[in-house]
Structure formats: C-alpha cells, structure tokens
C-alpha cells in the first residue's frame, strides 16, 4: 500500500513550507515527463548544450524520476524568490545600453549559494512530511542532478516556460529558484493546482534584447551564445565574435529577465541569505581585477561564484575591462595582471585581447 497524505496534511505541509521555511510557493506533480522528451532531444540535436556533456548523459533517468530515485511516486516542487532589488523594465533597458566601468554580476549570485540554501529548506520540508506520515522516503534536488526542474514546476502549476525558457509566473515574475523533492508519497488523490497559460503573447523583449542572440525559436537557449554559459559553465576561451557583446557582465546575465514586463511586479525576497554582498555589487572593474586569489577565496566564500575558480573570474573581468570606456589605468592594470598569469595562456589571451580593445577605444 502506497503512503499518502490527507488533504489536511497536505495543507499543513504547504503552511510549513511558506511560514516556517520562507519558500515562495509549493505544489505537486506526477512523474510523467514524456511530453517534454521531443523538446529536449531537439535541443540536444541542435547542439544548444555546447560542451555540457552531463546534459547528454543519464539516459531516461532525466524523464523517469523512478529510475533516478527508485520508489518515487510523486514530485513536490517549491520556489524561492531571490530578487533583491526592484526592477523597472524601462530603467533596465536604458542601463543595459549604457557602457560603464562597473562590473555586472547576475542577481542570483549576490548572496549565498542557492544550492545550499534551497537544499537545506527542502530537506527540512521532507523531514517535516516524515513526521506527519512516518516512512517518508525522499531525495531533494536543486539544479544538481538530471532533473527537469522547469517542466516539473510547469506541471505543478507554478508557472509557464517563457520564450527565454525561464519559468514565468504573473505574480512572481521569473526571479526565483526551483527545487524539487522526489518522494515515495502517492499524492495523486490530492487536487492539482491549475496550470498557467502561456502569457508571453507577441512580446519579443527578451529575444530582441539578448546581447548575443542566444534565444532561439521554440523556447530554446543556444548555450554556445548565452553569456551565463560563457562566463560560468565554459571552462575555455570565450569566442572572439562574442567578446564585444558581453559588455561588462563578469558572471552570468539577467538581461532576458530584466526586460521582461512580468518582472516589473516581481516581489523582493525576504530571504536574508540572498541579500546583496557589498563587496560584490556595483564594484568598479579594476577593483575586482586587483583581487588576488586569496581575495577571491575570501570574498566569494559561500557564494556560487566560487565554483568558477579564480582564473575564470579574471578571464571574465578582462573581457569586461576591455569593453569598458577607455582609460589608461585599464591598460596598466591589465598589463600588471599579466605578470601574475604569465604561465596561464588562457587568461593571458583574454588579458591581451582586453589591452588591444582598450587601445582601439583610445
């Protein structure tokens, strides 16, 4: 006999998630992801996954939760807002079109590493359910395994996948993390949350304003062009033809979200762990370029930024300094950094590019 939750218990779970864990929303979904297989396979066929080989591996486990975690009968899906400042589309568009010497870091990385924050909350939620039922077997995921978080959230009625492939929600916008619990509970008898209709309509804002043209038809992202991929997941050289377009974005890119009309109303997070770290936000590029590896380790402790490593961090900043308004100090700082990376050809290549770019701007 499968373990179930009563409607009253399910309400207790939702109340605990919102009130005690500060999660933004919670729902449940079944395990049938078959409708998403053609979409995913087409994305792979187009080579939009770049060199992310883990997106190819694991076979059917990505689409059949019970294969990844045997005994899974249902999926519990939760979201957690991370937006730490108001967004106004008109203001953002103007800012994004203005060149500056200030580093641009994706909002999600301003605070504590979301993997740690979200997983801790989901684990507490799973344990709370176990207290209610006894025998609750579960495993939590947040962007860390072959799990289709966005499709599962869409099935759970927490939003729709927009043209940017981000999960959208009229009330929450898109600035939220998604976490899931693969559970042995049978939640099929509980009422489903109503599905969200795709409300993007004819809007093309994210497509038109993507700096590198990474947003493709069919709600697909070409990772090979995506600045988030290029500055975070990419371990090698950033393609020459895309360097100018990266601007001063040194870690990730929020452009497709910042220009989305639904984010005009996105709520500000109340999660303390996601508040801005002063030493990462609105910082002059040269100040960050001057960091030593020891500084990098110190200031990125507990941050998702730590994952890319110091060399990639300097690689990214070099591109941004090259793209910033001309200043002789930029060239001097880049030349000085070359001494530190004299045995690292990858970083040297980007430092040299930035120096030449600054000379062209002079």
From Swiss-Prot:
Family: Belongs to the QueG family.
Any Gene Ontology CC annotation: cytoplasm
Binding residues for [4Fe-4S] cluster 2: 210, 226, 253, 256
The organism of origin for this protein: Francisella cf. novicida (strain Fx1)
SUPFAM superfamilies linked to this entry: 4Fe-4S ferredoxins (SSF54862)
InterPro entries documented for this protein: 4Fe4S_Fe-S-bd (IPR017896), 4Fe4S_Fe_S_CS (IPR017900), QueG (IPR004453), QueG_DUF1730 (IPR013542)
Biological or metabolic pathway of the protein: tRNA modification; tRNA-queuosine biosynthesis
GO molecular function, one term: 4 iron, 4 sulfur cluster binding
Keyword Ligase applies: no
Official protein name in the record: Epoxyqueuosine reductase
Subunit structure: Monomer.
Locations listed in the record: Cytoplasm
Active-site residues annotated for this sequence: 143
GO biological process: queuosine biosynthetic process; tRNA modification
